[in-house]
Curated annotation (Swiss-Prot):
InterPro entries cross-referenced by the UniProt entry: Poxvirus_M2
Processing after translation: Glycosylated by host.
Statement: the UniProt record of this protein carries the keyword Signal: yes
Gene from which this protein is expressed: OPG038
N-terminal signal peptide: 1-17
Family indicated by similarity: Belongs to the orthopoxvirus OPG038 family.
Protein location: Host endoplasmic reticulum; Secreted
GO biological process terms on file: symbiont-mediated suppression of host NF-kappaB cascade
Role of this protein: Plays a role in immune evasion. When secreted, inhibits T-cell activation by preventing the binding of host CD80 and CD86 to soluble CTLA4 and CD28. In the infected cell, may inhibits host NF kappa B activation.
Induction remarks: Expressed in the early phase of the viral replicative cycle.
Keywords: Early protein, Glycoprotein, Host endoplasmic reticulum, Host-virus interaction, Inhibition of host NF-kappa-B by virus, Secreted, Signal, Viral immunoevasion
Protein name (database record): Early protein OPG038
Subunit comment: Homooligomer. Interacts with host CD80 and CD86 when secreted.
Keyword Secreted: yes
Length: 220
């Protein structure tokens, strides 16, 4: 008798599982986007002619409310830290523009334009006099002067540097990840721009990133 009851229970359970239908869940409103937080342009005094697939490598960390990213490629090491922040770096991409200019796209978990952050950038020439510090200074924000960015350059290969936070444009052909990054930063008054030049005029360090081809940096 007990055996028959167990058998009937198993059959009933099997029948229920066959009749189960997937529940349609409501759509999410809090999508996990990559935010296009900053674009860094670096001019160098050696030839870089085109974007190389697999050239850029990255590592990132978040310690004591400081978000850090380290990028290597095209003869440079780029180390950037955003101090006292809730967000962290999630991705980066690099592309080569005209006149030996390297463009770096930086993506974070949150937008930068809501709170002014202090930023630290160290650029090291890996193959040309990397032990000599060429530049080490704080740069005030050239648009609104609400935050600062200290830039250290080790080596003699850098001709200019320009950093723009919360850019308002991006290459329309950049599709990593497709439809999951934001760049329509409408609050112009909260954006930042920093720049320093040595050989090139600073306006030569302002690339139109819509014209570049980028490759996403590989995580290490």
């Amino acid at each position: 008798m007990v055996y028959k009851l167990v058998l009937l229970f198993c059959i009933a359970s099997l029948g229920y599982s066959v009749e189960y239908k997937n529940t349609i869940c409501p759509p999410r409103q809090d999508y996990r986007y990559w935010y296009f937080a900053a674009e860094l342009t670096i001019g160098v005094n050696y030839d870089i002619n085109s974007t190389i697939i697999g050239e850029c490598h990255m590592s990132e960390s978040y310690i004591d409310r400081n978000a850090n990213i380290v990028l290597t490629g095209y003869g440079l090491e780029i180390n950037m830290t955003i101090m006292d922040t809730d967000q962290r770096f999630v991705a980066a991409a690099e592309g080569v523009g005209k006149d030996n200019k390297l463009s770096v796209l930086l993506f974070t978990t949150q937008r930068l334009d809501k709170v002014h952050h202090n930023i630290s950038v160290t650029i090291t020439c890996m193959e040309m006099n990397c032990g000599t510090t060429k530049y080490d200074s704080d740069l005030p924000e050239s648009i609104h002067k609400s935050s600062s960015c200290d830039i250290t350059i080790n080596g003699s290969c850098v001709t200019c540097v320009n950093l723009e936070t919360d850019p308002t444009k991006i290459n329309p052909h950049y599709l990593h990840p497709k439809d999951k990054y934001l760049y329509h930063n409408s609050e112009y008054g909260m954006r930042g721009s920093y720049g320093v030049t040595f050989i090139d005029e600073l306006n030569q360090c302002l690339l139109d990133i819509k014209e570049l081809s980028y490759d996403i940096c590989y995580r290490e």
